[in-house]
């Protein structure tokens, strides 16, 4: 009987977890075909999955940008999972499904810029403040988040499209084992090739190396990586942190000694599981997340 009850509880928990991973709704990033669309398949239509909390006391939202080396979008472990983590803690979360190879720059970046503008314009609809919208990127998604943080603008007031009137600048960024640089000595070769092609334009390499574009106006950052990462070198994170320090941008940095690439939330990988506790504390200190109920 005890074994049966245990199995029943396990099955119920599995069903509940599956139910929680279904977004409340999905938004199209563009009203029609995306600029430069190569077809009409799902991969040609950028979308945003919406995860809303039961209550949002700090009126905060986060655009979650999964990784995948610009060749795929790791939408479960680096998309739905962190979105649920945020929603469970009273923060609205939005998972971006952006275009990847064969699409190249500027498509993935443009999709994220448009998503930020779209969400900021819908802040009241989703119960968050337009000045409390962050971006959380993993791996190549971290590169996109870092570009949003460094090359954003305040909107295009003259545009006939009202979505373009809003800023695409995140109010804070969370960078998890991110690609930061497109320079060959630091960057992730596959991400660079998928985004810029086999023979990248040096001007695009320079433009998309985020470490060279931070200013005092760049948003606060939380950066997490591991020293052992043999896919995206930890130097990427260190370059971004050093650039934040030079520019006077608030930054919190955690590098664990051991851990492979792509650990996502690392819930079952001690001591790496501590990184989300550190993130939670950082968000609470900055009033982007309410303190946990005692």
PLM features: residue spans?
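A domain-start/cap signature at the N-terminus of enzymes
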Residues: 20-51, 190-191, 271, 275-277, ...
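Active-site nucleophile elbow and catalytic-triad environment of alpha/beta-hydrolase enzymes
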Residues: 46, 159-163, 198-213, 218-219
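Short beta-strand element of the alpha/beta-hydrolase
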Residues: 58-67
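Active-site glycine-rich loops that stabilize anionic/oxyanionic intermediates
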Residues: 66-71, 227
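Catalytic nucleophile-loop/oxyanion-hole region of alpha/beta-hydrolase
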Residues: 74-76, 80-81, 94-130, 267-272
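Primarily recognizes the serine-hydrolase "nucleophile elbow" in alpha/beta-hydrolase
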Residues: 114-187, 191, 205
């Amino acid at each position: 009987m005890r074994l049966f009850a245990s199995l029943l509880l396990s099955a119920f928990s599995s069903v509940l977890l599956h139910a929680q991973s279904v977004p409340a709704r999905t938004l199209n990033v563009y009203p029609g075909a995306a600029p430069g669309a190569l077809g009409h398949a799902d991969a040609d239509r950028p979308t945003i999955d919406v995860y809303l909390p039961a209550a949002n006391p700090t009126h905060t939202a986060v655009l979650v940008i999964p990784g995948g080396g610009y060749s795929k979008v790791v939408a479960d472990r680096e998309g739905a999972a962190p979105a649920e983590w945020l929603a469970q803690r009273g923060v609205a979360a939005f998972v971006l499904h952006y275009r990847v190879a064969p699409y190249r720059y500027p498509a993935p970046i443009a999709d994220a810029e448009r998503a930020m503008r779209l969400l900021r314009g819908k802040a009241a609809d989703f119960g968050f403040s337009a000045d409390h919208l962050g971006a959380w990127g993993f791996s190549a998604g971290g590169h996109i988040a870092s570009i949003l943080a460094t090359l954003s603008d305040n909107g295009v007031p003259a545009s006939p499209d009202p979505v373009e009137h809003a800023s695409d600048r995140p109010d804070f960024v969370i960078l998890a084992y991110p690609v930061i640089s497109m320079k060959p000595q630091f960057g992730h070769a596959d991400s660079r090739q998928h985004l810029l092609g086999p023979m990248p334009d040096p001007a695009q390499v320079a433009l998309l190396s985020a470490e060279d574009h931070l200013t005092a106006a760049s948003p606060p950052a939380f950066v997490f990586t591991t020293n052992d990462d043999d896919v995206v070198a930890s130097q990427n994170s260190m370059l971004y942190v050093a650039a934040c320090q030079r520019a006077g941008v608030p930054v919190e940095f955690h590098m664990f000694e051991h851990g492979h690439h792509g650990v996502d939330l690392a819930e079952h990988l001690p001591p790496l599981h501590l990184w989300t506790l550190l993130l939670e504390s950082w968000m609470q200190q900055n009033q982007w997340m309410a303190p946990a109920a005692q």
